[in-house]
Amino acid sequence: SPTVHEPATDGLASAHVPPLGLSNRAVEGASEVAAFTKPPNPEQLQSLTLWPEMEKLYGHGYELLSVAMDTNTHMIASTCKASTPAHAVVRLFDAQHRFEPAKDALEGHTLSITRVAFSPCGTYLLTVSRDRSWRMFRRTPSGYVAWIGERAHARIVWDGAWAPHSRMFATASRDKSVKIWTLVDDAQRPYRLVTTLNASDAVVSVTWASDGALAMGLENGDVWLYTCAQDGTWQLHTTLARHHTGPVHRVACRPQGRWMDEYDR
């Protein structure tokens, strides 16, 4: 009969971050840690859990703004604060090959790239920026190459997100709007604007649900949920007024549902 192995009881119980360090270290002989009765806060995660560091990735000149990973190719993309085109780039790292950095960074923006997002199919990489534009890169056998883009908003573009089927994407801006785009079979202009959803305040974040609903987080703390009717028109489904006391910087839908998690500062 198969042998059942009991979990080890002498494992490391906690960790801490040294005063001048960036990574947590195991604490030997730590006292017994009580089981959590509610989700741990950041301080508890830092002091009572051990997440082994695998690698540090370098290359940017300033603090990071956005990080994303493609689960198809295991590529990691990162961006940083930038006031010049030289720093407004996407750097790629191959997690399957010892986090080897790509030879060339992806260029095209002139100011900070505020969000980078891989399409679910792994073919495209979307970026949005403080320069009020979005750009898209397409994966080829030799790597990602610049493909399409547009200066689409009147103010900073804070977020960009892909629909589950990888044919549509949304961009959220400080100009109080979310624009929905779709890829089309047109060699001259392989994308078109589907619609513009106007909000009552600056839109800071946007995401798609698995059923195609669209959620947006506003600067005033509101969360709005839109759904698409059978005739293709978008309708405001739910408004969570002043759901937070500050800007809703991220919204996330459950993988197999419509409900959201929202995060402010």
Question: What does each model-found stretch correspond to?
Answer:
Residues 79-86, 128-131, 171-175, 202, ...:
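Conserved strand-to-loop turn within each blade of WD40 beta-propeller repeats
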Residues 1-62, 200, 204, 219-222, ...:
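Terminal intrinsically disordered, low-complexity extensions flanking WD-repeat/beta-propeller proteins
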Residues 98-100, 142-143, 186, 231:
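Short coil/turn linkers that define WD40 beta-propeller blade boundaries
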Residues 1-2, 39-43, 79, 87-95, ...:
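WD40-repeat beta-propellers
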Residues 47, 55-59, 102-108, 146-152, ...:
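Short C-terminal beta-strands that terminate individual repeats in beta-propeller domains
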Residues 62-69, 111-118, 154-162, 200-209, ...:
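Canonical WD40 repeat/beta-propeller blade segments in eukaryotic WD-repeat proteins
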